[in-house]
């Protein structure tokens, strides 16, 4: 999977992304609870797209959010939608970008299969978190539905969503996994950095 293909794919989808989005407040609330998104924490939002989770972070009174996406058009839309000193948008490849700062929480929401090197991504994100910080990979639908959807519409830019047990093993080098959940409603793997 080529990163330029990923950029092109999401740039094409960006203009209609929000129109096609289903924002389930109950699921997102549960995911953000698992992710430890609470008042005063700093958040690194990886593959933020058009800023889908920004209102939820701000409603929880986080200290600040750095939202990163590889797609320039996704970031452009996010910047138009949200401004303020608590949110900074960065158009970059999170695996190679020099993102200033270190964070309390890192969330990868509805995006993990689009990273061609999951082990490299986990390594990179571990380096962006404080000791005791939390990394959460989550999807607002089941693993089966994600993989079915990607096999039809995004096969060129998705490696598929691995099982929660396999992702927990990848996390294990840096994180103590305390949440590994995959059901008909959502997929969440989350752990605390040692």
Predicted segments, located by residue:
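Conserved class I S-adenosyl-L-methionine
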Residues: 1-36, 40-49, 136-162
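Class I SAM-dependent methyltransferase SAM/SAH-binding core
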Residues: 50-96
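A conserved beta-strand element that flanks and buttresses the S-adenosyl-L-methionine
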Residues: 107
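A short glycine-rich, Lys/Arg-flanked "PGG" loop and its adjoining helix->strand segment in the class I
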Residues: 120-131
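Short alpha-helix
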Residues: 158-174
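Core SAM-dependent methyltransferase catalytic element
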Residues: 176, 181-194
């Amino acid at each position: 999977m080529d990163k330029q293909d990923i950029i092109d794919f999401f740039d094409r989808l960006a203009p209609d992304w929000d129109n096609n989005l289903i924002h389930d407040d109950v699921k997102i609330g549960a995911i953000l609870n698992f992710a430890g998104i609470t008042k005063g924490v700093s958040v690194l939002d990886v593959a933020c797209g058009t800023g889908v989770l920004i209102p939820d972070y701000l409603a929880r009174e986080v200290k600040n959010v750095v939202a990163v996406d590889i797609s320039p058009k996704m970031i452009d839309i996010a910047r138009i939608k949200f401004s303020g000193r608590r949110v900074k948008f960065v158009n970059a490849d999170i695996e190679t970008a020099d993102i200033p700062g270190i964070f309390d929480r890192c969330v990868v929401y509805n995006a993990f299969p689009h990273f061609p090197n999951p082990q490299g991504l986990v390594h990179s994100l571990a380096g962006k978190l404080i000791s005791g910080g939390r990394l959460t990979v989550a999807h607002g639908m089941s693993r089966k539905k994600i993989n079915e959807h990607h096999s039809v519409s995004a096969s060129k830019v998705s490696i598929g969503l691995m099982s929660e047990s396999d992702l927990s093993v990848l996390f294990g080098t840096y994180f103590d996994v305390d949440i590994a959940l995959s059901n008909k409603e959502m997929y969440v793997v989350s752990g605390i950095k040692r």
